[in-house]
């Protein structure tokens, strides 16, 4: 048996003592007393902050929402099926934040900014708080740059500016998502970063939107944040704030961003579910008292920054679903009062084949013509009034037996104006083509055509104008004004096309 020498033992002991690192740390620990329905109640955690992240022993994370005298109410960011009563919970000392970087462009992620498109991890060196304060009054400037949606009805009569918040509201299946996605498609080549947030949607619907973006080449400048209908309520509640944090990252880097929240009704329902399970007192329609603050703190983050901050912008298009056209319900009235206008989609118009089914009469943009180029103001200034008068006259005409010639002409013009506002999905128009289309309708060039021929004629006119009068587009894009020269070119193109069209009809 070999004998150990004293000096060897001494050397080993000395090495062990030198390697010993006495590190003492204090951790805020609690214990689970109740768990279920996406909620956990914890005793302990005396030093926790509101909104702080906590970590359970088996790895699930949660957010502290209710801080009570005897326990803490935690909402779980997962199913929590493996959490056991009596297990330990550790406070992390951090408020919820996500990584942010340019690498997120073209990706589909969840509310925790984790990729769900199977294309691998996203490398990011920076992070942002999911909930950060909105820009102050001093940090902002008034909205003055147009954000073109590519939809004639919106760009001519309900203009949206960069930094504006415009609500898209309507019943289910009226084309709300189509208006939002067409707006994203129209940002191609406009140097605008788009974020599409899907809250509580069917996975098949989100997949269809993503496929559409890929086919049209829009994913290059778009980030999709998706929490499906089967996701925990906590993640559905967080998804819009995650999207806003990503959009803010680009806004503060002097970029223009557009964010779609589809839709905030589902987020409010998820928040109501969480609040009721946390035993917060219910208010109107069983929503908690702070549901207005839920949406106001989200939508106030949209802004047009001043020149000192780089003039970046974040334009928000929240979507809210109504029941049977009832805009006086709790969530619709809340969001209407927060936003800078609303685009109202009508199921009656949709069923009548008028798509996009925008009710121009009760839709409004509180920014108004400040968000339009001068050429559009010159051409489309009276369109909304003419359509409103047409709708009024049409209602009257149902009861009148005979109408005078002026009223008949006004009705005929109104029907053609309504016809030119029709657009197929995923077919946004450049502003120059919109101006040509509206001018043709408002100046009476369509009056001689049958209503069924209007859209065919306008398609041919736009193609003819592009092929034979490229100077028209150059004048509008350079001067942003509908000059005399532009008007002469457009009149020539319309006359030529009318002659060609009448010949085609004869043959």
From Swiss-Prot:
Its main location: plastid. It is a peripheral membrane protein. It comes from the Eukaryota. ATP binds at residues 170-177. Keywords: ATP synthesis, ATP-binding, CF(1), Chloroplast, Hydrogen ion transport, Ion transport, Membrane, Nucleotide-binding, Plastid, Thylakoid, Translocase, Transport. The record marks 363 as: Required for activity. It is found in: Plastid, Chloroplast thylakoid membrane. One of its GO terms (cellular component) is proton-transporting ATP synthase complex. It catalyses: ATP + H2O + 4 H(+)(in) = ADP + phosphate + 5 H(+)(out). It is an enzyme of class 7 (translocase). Its EC number is 7.1.2.2. GO terms for molecular function: ADP binding; ATP binding; proton-transporting ATP synthase activity, rotational mechanism. HAMAP family: ATP_synth_alpha_bact. Produces ATP from ADP in the presence of a proton gradient across the membrane. The alpha chain is a regulatory subunit. F-type ATPases have 2 components, CF(1) - the catalytic core - and CF(0) - the membrane proton channel. CF(1) has five subunits: alpha(3), beta(3), gamma(1), delta(1), epsilon(1). CF(0) has four main subunits: a, b, b' and c. Belongs to the ATPase alpha/beta chains family. This is ATP synthase subunit alpha, chloroplastic. It comes from Lolium perenne. The gene is atpA.
């Amino acid at each position: 048996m070999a004998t150990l020498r004293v000096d060897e033992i001494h050397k080993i002991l000395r090495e062990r003592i030198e390697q010993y690192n006495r590190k003492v740390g204090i951790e805020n620990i609690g214990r689970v007393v109740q768990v279920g329905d996406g909620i956990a109640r914890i005793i302990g955690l005396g030093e926790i902050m509101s909104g702080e992240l906590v970590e359970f022993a088996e790895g699930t994370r949660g957010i502290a929402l209710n801080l009570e005298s005897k326990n803490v109410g935690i909402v779980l960011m997962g199913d929590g099926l493996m959490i056991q009563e009596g297990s330990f919970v550790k406070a992390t000392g951090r408020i919820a934040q996500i990584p942010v970087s340019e690498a997120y462009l073209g990706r589909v992620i969840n509310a925790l900014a984790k990729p769900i498109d199977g294309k691998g991890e996203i490398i990011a060196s920076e992070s942002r708080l999911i909930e950060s304060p909105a820009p102050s009054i001093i940090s902002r400037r008034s909205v003055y740059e147009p954000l073109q949606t590519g939809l004639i009805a919106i760009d001519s009569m309900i203009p949206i500016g960069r930094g504006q918040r415009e609500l898209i509201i309507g019943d289910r299946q009226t084309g709300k998502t189509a208006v939002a996605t067409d707006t994203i498609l129209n940002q191609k080549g406009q140097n605008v970063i788009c974020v599409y947030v899907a809250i509580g949607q069917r996975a098949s619907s989100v997949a269809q939107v993503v496929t559409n973006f890929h086919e049209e080449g829009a994913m290059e400048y778009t980030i999709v944040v998706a929490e499906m209908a089967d996701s925990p309520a906590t993640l559905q509640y967080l998804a819009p704030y995650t999207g806003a944090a990503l959009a803010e990252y680009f806004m503060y880097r002097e970029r223009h961003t557009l964010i779609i929240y589809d839709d905030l009704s589902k987020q409010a329902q998820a928040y109501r579910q969480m609040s009721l399970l946390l035993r917060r007192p219910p208010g109107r329609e069983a929503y908690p008292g702070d549901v207005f603050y839920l949406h106001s703190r989200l939508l106030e983050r949209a802004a047009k920054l001043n020149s000192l901050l780089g003039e970046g912008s974040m334009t928000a298009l929240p979507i809210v679903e109504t029941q049977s056209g009832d805009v006086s319900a709790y969530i619709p009235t809340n969001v209407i009062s927060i936003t800078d206008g609303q685009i109202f989609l009508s199921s009656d118009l949709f069923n009548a084949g008028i798509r996009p089914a925008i009710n121009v009469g009760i839709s409004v943009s509180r920014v108004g013509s400040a968000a339009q180029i001068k050429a559009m103001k010159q051409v489309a200034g009276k369109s909304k009034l003419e359509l409103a008068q047409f709708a009024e006259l049409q209602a009257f005409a149902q009861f009148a037996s005979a109408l005078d010639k002026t009223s008949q002409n006004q009705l005929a013009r109104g029907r053609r104006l309504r016809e030119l506002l029709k657009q197929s999905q995923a077919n946004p128009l450049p502003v120059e083509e919109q101006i040509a289309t509206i001018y043709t309708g408002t100046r009476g060039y369509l009056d001689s055509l049958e209503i069924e021929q209007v859209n065919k004629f306008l398609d041919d006119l736009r193609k003819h104008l592009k092929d034979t009068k490229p100077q028209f587009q150059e004048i509008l894009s350079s001067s942003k004004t509908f000059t005399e020269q532009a008007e002469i070119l457009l009149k020539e193109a319309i006359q030529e096309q009318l002659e060609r069209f009448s010949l085609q009809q004869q043959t």
